C-alpha cells in the first residue's frame, strides 16, 4: 500500500495509477470507514491539493477531476466504502 499526502494529510492508498502526459495525473483508491468518513469528506471538499507521493518522489499542485464511491451510507458502524479519486496537475499559480 502506498502513502499519499493531500494538503499535509497522510492517506494509505489501496490502489494507485500514475500518468504524466499531457499533465501529471494520479488515480487512486481509498478504503474509507464509517469512522474516517467525515475527515476524508472534509478533506476532499477542498478540491485543490498539494499532492505528494513520497514513494514515487512525486509532488505537484492538483485538482480533483474525478470521484466515485462504492457505498453512499457510511453512517452505519463498521461500513467501508471504496473511494476512487483522480487528481490532475494544475498551473502552480492557479487556486480554486
From Swiss-Prot:
Domain of life of the source: Bacteria
Xref: Gene3D superfamilies: YkvR-like
Pfam families: DUF3219
Protein name from the UniProt record: Uncharacterized protein YkvR
